[in-house]
């Protein structure tokens, strides 16, 4: 017979969520830095 799983605590859920958000923030920061570099190179190439 199927038994419902125990509910994940709010603190554990928030911990995992904050971890995911922190990693996403780092990735977004890297992507933005790379985009800025590419844009600078393209602008300097024209001059």
From Swiss-Prot:
One of the record's GO molecular function terms: structural constituent of ribosome
Keywords, sorted A to Z: Plastid, Ribonucleoprotein, Ribosomal protein
Segments passing through the bilayer: none
InterPro entries, sorted: Ribosomal_bL32, Ribosomal_zn-bd
Cysteine-cysteine disulfides: none
GO cellular component, as recorded: large ribosomal subunit; plastid
One annotated GO biological process: translation
UniProt subcellular location: Plastid
One Pfam family cited in the UniProt record for this chain: Ribosomal_L32p
Family designation: Belongs to the bacterial ribosomal protein bL32 family.
Name the record gives this protein: Large ribosomal subunit protein bL32c
Organism: Prototheca wickerhamii
Gene designation per UniProt: rpl32
